[in-house]
Amino acid sequence: ALVLTMGLTSCDGLLDLTPKSEISQDDYFKTESDLQLFSNSFYNNLLDKSPFDDQSDLYVQQNLSDEMLGGNNRTVPASGGGWTWTDLRKMNTLLAYVNQCSDENAVVKYTALTRFFRAFFYFEKVKRFGDVPWYDVELGSADEALYKPRDSRELVMTKMIEDIDYAIDNLPAREEESSSPFRVNRWAALALKAQFCLYEGTYRKYHDLKLEGNDYTYYLDLAAKAAGEIINDGPYKLYSTGHPESDYLNLFAAEDANPDEYILAIKFDYSLAIHHNANGHTLVPTQGRPGLTRKMVNMYLMKDGSRFTDQPGWQEMSFLEETKDRDPRLAQSIRTPGYTRIGETTVLPPDLSVTVTGYQPIKFVQEPTASGGQVDRNDRNTNDLPVYRYAEVLLNYAEAKAELGTLTQEDLDISVNLLRDRAGMNDAHLNMAAANANPDRYLSAKETGYPNVSGSNKGVILEIRRERAVELNQEGFRFDDLVRWKAGACIDQDIYGMYFAGAGEYDLSGDGNPDVILYNKGTAKPEAGSGVLVYEIGKDILLTGSNSGYVYSHKNIVRNGFNEERDYLYP
């Protein structure tokens, strides 16, 4: 409450007001071009940061985020911290003046577009703060409404649904072909509705949120219907060339967004100096040393659909053993034995100097020749990034139906099992009856999973969560998922990497030659060939045991824990 009061005592702390005279309704908003130019800035909200560097229990960097450190490290600045409202003011400004345009079709179109972005804006605020003040009019510096308290979550969600339904009803189905993945259309609006209704429904269910108005089933039903409309009536499909060993990787590494799967994407362009940092982030030692965690790798099924964590001896398998015969998406998400970069023939091992866990990410990594051969430098990627893609819609549909208790095998066959088909796992479909008859112990355990999942659909809900983690890994969903599932305890779990049995030579590329040599303290440092990393156990590389175990790079980092009473929302 104190933080809110402080924010409300300053006009620019709340709505970041600018003089109203800067935009004159007599001079602007008269043509469709005016509306388009003014609304272009709204697109900057879609990706406020790179999705591939979000940290969680499944993906970490050398320096842990405040959320991962927990305790007093998770602080909110006196101003900012997400409590910024400038973009909302711009949206409400356009809505206040849009009728000055004489083109009625343009008025409807840009009203719909702006209401899409207002729903998007408030979704981000609700996720972060819970209750927030709702503003749908342009405010001046003297307006008393600046000082009103937060509105209820129920009111804000109701208004968001009104906005997104207007957008769905009035946005075009598809823009001109050249810009279709980069402009908001009615399918993107449906994708947003499915996303925020799934979030709200599961948040209310698992947090046992009792509010006046609609219960969690109302939102889950809306999510399922919105996703179902895209599935049944939309023009989208999963990208596939019939090469399951590379299609998933190539989808994200491609320069241009695939219009079949990407419903909405962000355009990057080397000639315009609009870049992101996927290559530098994963290939340069000073860019964070990201890595998937052992928990994430454990989630990938065997290629035949059986669970890796049901295999004998899975806890202490070598890297060569644990990556064999797995879901093909694993080898398209991290470097595994036999890995070569796109367009190259040299086999490369995971490079422990650039990954904190040993599981080196390759998703979104472009070929070395991209960006004029400069792509491996800091901030030089130009491959387009997804905001909404069809795969997420399929997962949202399956999860909403499962949580509602209305899921059928047919629903799985038009959603989750299409993802497995694309991955080449045609004979490893998710079977609802089998999953519910034998819920996965690993995903049920307090130490590694979600012990609060229960009911007759427990098994299939766990498997849908597995599929979501695998398919959407490194796309910025995980922390939000943990929040809505009330699974913050996952943040507290130990962060492990690949397993090493002790001192010795380790082949990580599968070519029969050592890539890493470990030796014990007090013994002579081994001689090594070019490119071979030599690490002293306990000094250069930390393991869970004194001389063997999982990579445990954060072993000496003090983590203060996730506070269940505080950390699901910011103040």
Residue ranges of predicted features:
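An aromatic- and glycine-enriched ligand-binding surface/loop that stacks and positions planar moieties
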Residues: 12-68, 157, 165-168, 183-190, ...
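A long, glycine-enriched binding/interface module in the latter
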Residues: 166, 182-185, 189, 409-570
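Short coil/linker segments at helix-helix boundaries
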Residues: 131-153, 203-221
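Short coil/turn linking the two alpha-helices of tandem helical-hairpin repeats
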Residues: 126-133, 175, 196-208, 403-406
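C-terminal motif of bacterial Sec signal peptides marking the signal peptidase cleavage site
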Residues: 8-10
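Conserved, well-structured interaction surfaces
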Residues: 24, 32-40, 44-48, 64-130, ...
